Every structure is written in structure tokens, then in C-alpha cells.
Amino acid sequence: MLTAELAAALARVALANVERAYPRRLDQLLVAPDAEWRPRTLHPAFYGSYDWHSAVHMHWLLARLLRLYPELRERASIEQTLDRHLTPEAVLRELAFFSAPGGTTFERP
């Protein structure tokens, strides 16, 4: 059962992970020698965690915890992190990735 105490612990883990760019597993297809590969540049919204898919899950977890526990003491940190990561520019860059060659590979739409 998810308690407020467990929710706070999960929030702290997710907050640490979404900011951690390395170590990183890269799952994209590089189609040119000068193709961008750095996590923060390639995926400005979802650069943290071990891989892109995990970063998406961590962001989902943070949003879900806010909904389930609106009084969570980590609320301000979660909101600041989501606001910093999920900007219109960052989301547009993520969308552009999916339109590029190789952008619809494993675990991506």
C-alpha cells in the first residue's frame, strides 16, 4: 500500500534520477557522424535516469504522486523540476526527435 511516507521516499528517488544524466544507456540510431548524442541536448525533457524510457516513467511517477498526495512535503521540488523539464521548447525538441530518422525505435511511439 502506498503511504505518504513511501510516496515521499519514491519522490526523492525520482527527483534524484531525473537530474542524473550519467550513467546513460543510449538507444537512438545515429545517422551521421556529427549526430547529437549527449542526453541533455538530445532529450531536454527526459535526459535523466538510466535511459529515456526510465526518465519518462520517473516524470510520470512525480506527477502521479502530486495527484495522489497533494500535501507531499516534496511538492515544491517536484513542481519546480517538472516546470524546468517540461517546457514547451523541451517538449517540441522531444517531438522533433520522433520525426527524425531512427526516432521511432525501441520503446518509443
Say what each PLM segment does.
Residues 1-47:
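Low-complexity, Ser/Thr/Pro/Gly-enriched N-terminal "stalk/linker" regions
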